[in-house]
A protein has these predicted regions:
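Papain-like cysteine protease catalytic cores
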Residues: 1-129
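Active-site signature of cysteine proteases
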Residues: 127-143
């Protein structure tokens, strides 16, 4: 049924979305209205949010790039961040392209709400049980 490790299946309920590369937007749509009908609108809103907050996103991307590239000067960092920003916009505009944390941040900003879409806790387990189980699984290196 799933390619997830058993330690995930034990604690999470898999939720199926179309396998077209838009899974993040599909999941947000499902959480808003119960189906994937808002997917394209959410992708459009992601693009609009990027453009409305372009300088802020470039600033965030610059910080991310700087963390991994200590030797780059500010001009290089800004150029790389601008390229990354334009790529993020292109991804949001293109059907079937996978979103990332920048797209999730844009959606969170637009919707003015916290988004937790990567998992859905199994109703029989508390969050503390879940976290301690993952900690134990990580110690056993079963990932």
């Amino acid at each position: 049924m799933s390619l997830l490790p058993n330690c995930f299946i034990e604690y999470f309920l898999p939720i199926q979305t179309p396998g077209d590369g838009n899974c993040m937007w599909h999941m947000v749509s499902r959480s808003l209205c119960g189906n994937c009908s808002l997917t394209n609108l959410l992708k459009d809103m992601t693009v609009i949010t990027f453009f409305m907050l372009e300088q802020k996103f470039i600033e965030i991307m610059t910080i991310d790039i700087r963390a991994n590239n200590k030797d780059a000067n500010e001009i290089q960092l800004r150029e790389q961040a601008t390229q990354r920003f334009h790529r993020a916009v292109q991804v949001a505009k293109t059907p079937g392209e996978w979103g990332d944390e920048y797209h999730l941040l844009a959606l969170t900003t637009f919707l003015a709400t916290k988004i937790s879409i990567y998992n859905f806790y199994h109703p029989n387990f508390s969050k503390n049980e879940l976290l301690s189980s993952f900690r134990r699984a990580g110690e056993r290196q079963i990932w």
